[in-house]
Curated annotation (Swiss-Prot):
Source organism of the structure: Vibrio vulnificus (strain YJ016)
Residues that hold ATP according to the record: 620
Protein name: Leucine--tRNA ligase
E.C. numbers: 6.1.1.4
Protein's gene: leuS
InterPro entries: aa-tRNA-synth_I_CS, aa-tRNA-synth_Ia, Leu-tRNA-ligase, Leu_tRNA-synth_edit, M/V/L/I-tRNA-synth_anticd-bd, Methionyl/Leucyl_tRNA_Synth, Rossmann-like_a/b/a_fold, tRNAsynth_Ia_anticodon-bd
Catalytic activity annotation: tRNA(Leu) + L-leucine + ATP = L-leucyl-tRNA(Leu) + AMP + diphosphate
Enzyme class label: ligase
C-alpha cells in the first residue's frame, strides 16, 4: 500500500471496482436471511445537501453492517421527482420541468456515487416516468371500483388575478406570492381516497411497531385523533335539526349557545336576509385557518337570529356563526359550554353570552370561573337528575337518556380526514378519470393507461399547461367523446408506495407479489421526523390497500424507523440599509473564539463585522449550507462519512464543525499509518492464546471487548458515535503497544483486521484498501468480526483498597482469589500498611473483583 493516505485515488479505484463487479446488485435468495434497508428517497433539487448526506450515510452504514452479518441486503435508491419546485425552477430558467428534473437526477446520481453509497442501481427509478406512475394510475382506478375513491367539492386557495389555484406555501400573508392579490377560498370538485375507512386499523397497528420512535407513534395517534363522544340533535325553530358532536356530554346542561361553521347550510340560510351576516361569512371563508392557528387567533362570531332548543331541558339558546368552528370536523357545529371550555369562554365573554357552570372539582375545592373556564373532569351539579355523577357515569347516563329519546347516539369520531389527492398543478401524475358528455365520470380502462403527462411544454407560471391546452383533455370513452381530468395527483401518492416498487421495479404490474413478499416489510427505514404524519401515515395506509388487493401479506411497510437529526451550522448576517438581514455564508467569515470556543468576533470577506445568529439548521434562506461536494473534494468521502457518524447520535441534531472534519481525517491517517507500518514488516503469525504474557492478554482482551461493544452499539442500540469512539480508544492503545515479539505482532494483526472490518461500514473505501494490504480477500463479502469469549476472561483483577473510606492503594490479584488471599495482599500493600500503623482493624469488607474496604480506629 502507498505510504501516504490519498483518498481521491483510493475512492475512485474502489468505486470503479464496485461498479464493474456490480457488488451491490441483489436478487431474491430464499436460502439467505434478507435485510431491506431504505433511506427516504431524495427530491432531485439539483445538488445534495448535508441533510441528504447524513440520511444516506446512516442507511449505508446499516446496510454494509448487515451485509457483513451474512444477510442478503437490498439498499435501493430513486427519485421523488414530481412537485412544485420543478415548476418554479422551470419558470425562472425558462425551460420545462422535465429536462430540469432529469439533469438534476444525473448530477445528484454522480454525487451519490462519489460518496460511496452501496446502492443497487438496477432498481433505480424516477417517479415522474410513465413506467412508474402508470401503475399508480391503474391502482387508483381499482380503488375507485372498490368504492374507496370519491369526488366532492372542497375548498382551495384561489388567486382571482392569475385565475389559478395556489398551494398553501404559495400564499404569503393571505396574498398570492406572484402578484400580491388577496387570495380567496374557492370550492372546487376534488378526488379523495377513503383513508378514514382504515382509521381504526391505522391506530391499532401503531402498537405493533416496536421499532418506531415513541414520538412518531404519538404524533400519528394525535393526527388520527380517535375520540369517543355523543352525536346529538338540537331542534332549531323553523329549520332542520342541528347535529353536534361532543366528547363532553357531561357538560350538556351548561350549554348557552351553539356555534356553527361559516360553511354550514344553516349559516347560508340565515345569511339570505342578513347582509351583515353574509359579509361576515365571506370574511370567515377567506381566512383559511390551519388547526395550529385556531388556538391563538381572535375568536369572532355573529348571531344568526336562529334559536336552538336544548335537547334535555328545553332551554332556548342562540345560534352563532363562529370563525373557530371547522366545517370538516365532526358536523360543522358545536355545543358551546363557556364555563367548561376555554374557547367557548373567550367567545362568550366577548359577546356577553351566559356562562353557566355545571361541573365542580372532585376534591371539593371551590369552583372559580371568574378568569377562565374550568376544563377538568369533575362532579356534576345544577344538572337535574345527573347531579353528583362523575365524568364516566355522567357520560353514560346522559348518552343513554339522549338515545332513549331519539335525540342522540354514542359515536366514535376521528380527527383524520379523507386524503384529498387532487392538485391543480402540472408537474404530477395525471389522475386517470374521464367525464363523458352526459356528465358521467369513468376510470380510464387499464389498456389505455398510462395517461401520459406531456413533457415538452411551455410554463407561463400561471396556468398548468395541460389545463391551458384544451386539446390535451379531449379523448373518447367507449367511442363517445370525453374530457380527461386535468388535475394531477398529490406527490405524496408516488412516495406512498415507492418502497414496494423497488422489490420488482420491472414488474408488469404495480408489483410482483412473490418478490415483494420476499423483501417486505422494509427492515430499516431512515428519514426525517417532519414526515411523521403525512408520508409515514400515507405509506402505512397504502400498504394496507396493497395487502387488501392481494399484493402483499404483511400489515405494515416499515419494521424499524430511525429519524435522523437535522444538520446545523453557524449562521452569520449583517443588517442592510433597509434594516433587513443579509445572510453571509460561514465559509466567507473569519471568526475569533475565546477559551471556551465561543465566538467573540466575526468579520466577512468584505471586512464587515457580522452578527453570529448561532448554530441553526442548514438552509438556503440562511445561506449557511455547506456543500458536501467541496468537503469530499477536500478531505475525501470517507472522512465526511466518518464525521457524520461520529459527531452526534444519529437521531440528534449534528453541529457542523470543520475542525471536527479535520479530526476525522487525522484519525483515518493514523489508522492508515499503523496498518502500513505493520504490513511493511511482512506477514504476522497467528495468535497463540496459551503463550501470551499478562500485558499481551490485557491488550487482546481490549480488542475483543471493543468488538463486543461495537457490535452491540451498531446492531442493537444504533449509537454509531459510541461505536466509533470505542474504535478510536482501541487505536490509541494499539499505537502505544510494543512490537518486539512475534506474538506482539500477531495480536496487532488480529486487532487491525478487526478495526478495519468494524470501520468498513462507515469508511468503506479506505478499509477496502487496508483489508487487501492485511492479506485479506474482498471485504465487501467478508464476515463481521466476532469476539472470543475466552479472550474476555480476565486472569487478574485490579482491586482498590480503602482505609476508612479513602483510597490508599491498588492491588492486582488472581481473578479467582479468595477473600482471605485478597485481604493478605491488601493489608501488606506498602501504602495501606503505613495507614494501618498503630490502629485497630474493626472490620474488613470485600466486594469481589472490585474493592477491599478496611475500617479501623
Amino acid at each position: 500500500m502507498q505510504e501516504q493516505y490519498n483518498p481521491q485515488d483510493i475512492e475512485q479505484k474502489v468505486q470503479q471496482h464496485w461498479d464493474n463487479n456490480k457488488t451491490f446488485v441483489v436478487t431474491e435468495d430464499p436460502t439467505k436471511e434478507k435485510f431491506y434497508c431504505l433511506s427516504m428517497f431524495p427530491y432531485p433539487s439539483g445538488r445534495l445537501h448535508m441533510g441528504h448526506v447524513r440520511n444516506y450515510t446512516i442507511g449505508d452504514v446499516v446496510s454494509r453492517f448487515q451485509r457483513l452479518q451474512g444477510k442478503n441486503v437490498m439498499q435501493p435508491i430513486g427519485w421523488d421527482a414530481f412537485g412544485l419546485p420543478a415548476e418554479n425552477a422551470a419558470v425562472k430558467n425558462n425551460t420545462a420541468p422535465a429536462p430540469w428534473t432529469y439533469e438534476n437526477i444525473e448530477y445528484m446520481k454522480n454525487q451519490l456515487k462519489l460518496l460511496g453509497f452501496g446502492y443497487d442501481w438496477n432498481r433505480e427509478f424516477a417517479t415522474c416516468t410513465p413506467e412508474y406512475y402508470r401503475w399508480e394510475q391503474e391502482f387508483f382506478t381499482k380503488l375507485y371500483q372498490k368504492g374507496l375513491v370519491y369526488k366532492k367539492t372542497s375548498s382551495v386557495n384561489w388567486c382571482p388575478n392569475d385565475q389559478t389555484v395556489l398551494a398553501n406555501e404559495q400564499v404569503e400573508d393571505g396574498c398570492c406570492w406572484r402578484c400580491d392579490t388577496p387570495v380567496e377560498q374557492k370550492e372546487i370538485p376534488q378526488w379523495f381516497i377513503k383513508i378514514t375507512e382504515y382509521a381504526q386499523e391505522l391506530l391499532d397497528d401503531l402498537d405493533t411497531l416496536e421499532g418506531w420512535p415513541e414520538m412518531v407513534k404519538t404524533m400519528q395517534r394525535n393526527w388520527i385523533g380517535r375520540s369517543e363522544g355523543v352525536e346529538l340533535k338540537f331542534e332549531v325553530k323553523g329549520q332542520q335539526d342541528l347535529e353536534v358532536y361532543t366528547t363532553r356530554p357531561d357538560t350538556l346542561m351548561g350549554v348557552t349557545y351553539v356555534g356553527i361553521a361559516a360553511g354550514h347550510p344553516l349559516a347560508k340560510i340565515a345569511a339570505e336576509n342578513n347582509p351583515d351576516l353574509a359579509a361576515f361569512i365571506e370574511e370567515c371563508k377567506n381566512t383559511k385557518v390551519a388547526e395550529a392557528e385556531l388556538a391563538t387567533m381572535e375568536k369572532k362570531g355573529m348571531a344568526t337570529g336562529l334559536t336552538a332548543i336544548h335537547p334535555l331541558n328545553g332551554r332556548e339558546v342562540p345560534v352563532y356563526v363562529a370563525n373557530f368552528v371547522l366545517m370538516d370536523y365532526g358536523t360543522g357545529a358545536v355545543m358551546a359550554v363557556p364555563a367548561h371550555d376555554q374557547r367557548d369562554f373567550e367567545f362568550a365573554t366577548k359577546y356577553g353570552l351566559d356562562i353557566i357552570p355545571v361541573i365542580k372539582p372532585i376534591d371539593g375545592s371551590e369552583l372559580d370561573i371568574s378568569e377562565a373556564a374550568y376544563t377538568e373532569k369533575g362532579v356534576l351539579f345544577d344538572s337535574g337528575e345527573f347531579d353528583g355523577l362523575e365524568f364516566q357515569a355522567a357520560f353514560d347516563a346522559i348518552a343513554a337518556k339522549l338515545e332513549a329519546e331519539g335525540k342522540g347516539t354514542k359515536t366514535v369520531n376521528f380527527r383524520l380526514r379523507d386524503w384529498g389527492v387532487s392538485r391543480q398543478r402540472y408537474w404530477g401524475a395525471p389522475i386517470p378519470m374521464v367525464t363523458t358528455e352526459d356528465g358521467q365520470v369513468h376510470p380510464v380502462p387499464a389498456d389505455q393507461l398510462p395517461v401520459i403527462l406531456p413533457e415538452d411544454v411551455v410554463m407561463d407560471g400561471v396556468t398548468s399547461p395541460i389545463k391551458a391546452d384544451k386539446e390535451w383533455a379531449k379523448t373518447t370513452f367507449n367511442g363517445e367523446p370525453a374530457l380527461r381530468e386535468t388535475d394531477t395527483f398529490d406527490t405524496f401518492m408516488e412516495s406512498s408506495w415507492y418502497y414496494a416498487r423497488y422489490c420488482s421495479p420491472q414488474a408488469d404490474d404495480i408489483l410482483d407479489p412473490e418478490k415483494a413478499n420476499y423483501w417486505l416489510p422494509v427492515d430499516q427505514y431512515i428519514g426525517g421526523i417532519e414526515h411523521a404524519c403525512m408520508h409515514l401515515l400515507y405509506s402505512r395506509f397504502f400498504h394496507k390497500l396493497l395487502r387488501d388487493a392481494g399484493y402483499v401479506t404483511s400489515d405494515e411497510p416499515f419494521k424499524q424507523l430511525l429519524c435522523q437529526g437535522m444538520v446545523l451550522a453557524d449562521a452569520f448576517y449583517y443588517t442592510n440599509d433597509k434594516g433587513g438581514k443579509e445572510w453571509v455564508s460561514p465559509t466567507e467569515v473569519k471568526v475569533e473564539r475565546d477559551g471556551k470556543g465561543r465566538i467573540t468576533s466575526a468579520v466577512d470577506n468584505e471586512g464587515r463585522n457580522v452578527e453570529h445568529s448561532g448554530m441553526i439548521k442548514m438552509s438556503k434562506s440562511k445561506n449557511n449550507g455547506i456543500d458536501p461536494q467541496e468537503m469530499v473534494d477536500k478531505y475525501g468521502a470517507d472522512t465526511v462519512r466518518l464525521f457524520m457518524m461520529f459527531a452526534s447520535p444519529a437521531d440528534m441534531t449534528l453541529e457542523w464543525q470543520e475542525s471536527g472534519v479535520e479530526g476525522a481525517n487525522r484519525f483515518l491517517k493514523r489508522v492508515w499509518k499503523l496498518v502500513n507500518e505493520h504490513t511493511s514488516k511482512g506477514a504476522a503469525e497467528a495468535v497463540n492464546a496459551a503463550a501470551l504474557s499478562g500485558d499481551q492478554k490485557a491488550l487482546r482482551r481490549d480488542v475483543h471487548k471493543t468488538i463486543a461493544k461495537v457490535t452491540d452499539d451498531v446492531a442493537r442500540r444504533q449509537t454509531f458515535n459510541t461505536a466509533i469512539a470505542a474504535v478510536m480508544e482501541l487505536m490509541n492503545k494499539l499505537a502505544k503497544a510494543p512490537q518486539e515479539s512475534a506474538q506482539d505482532r500477531a495480536i496487532l494483526d488480529e486487532a487491525l483486521k478487526a478495526v478495519v472490518a468494524m470501520l468498513y461500514p462507515i469508511t468503506p473505501h479506505i478499509c477496502f484498501e487496508m483489508w487487501t494490504a492485511l492479506g485479506q480477500q474482498d471485504i465487501d463479502n467478508a464476515s463481521w468480526p466476532t469476539y472470543d469469549e475466552q479472550a474476555l476472561v480476565e486472569d487478574e483483577k485490579l482491586i482498590v483498597v480503602q482505609v476508612n473510606g479513602k483510597v490508599r492503594g491498588k492491588i492486582t490479584v488472581a481473578a479467582d482469589a479468595t477473600k482471605e488471599q485478597v485481604e493478605e495482599i491488601g493489608l501488606n500493600e506498602e501504602n495501606v500498611s503505613k495507614h494501618l500503623d498503630g490502629v485497630t482493624i474493626r472490620k474488613v469488607i470485600y466486594v469481589p473483583g472490585k474493592l477491599l474496604s478496611i475500617v479501623a480506629n
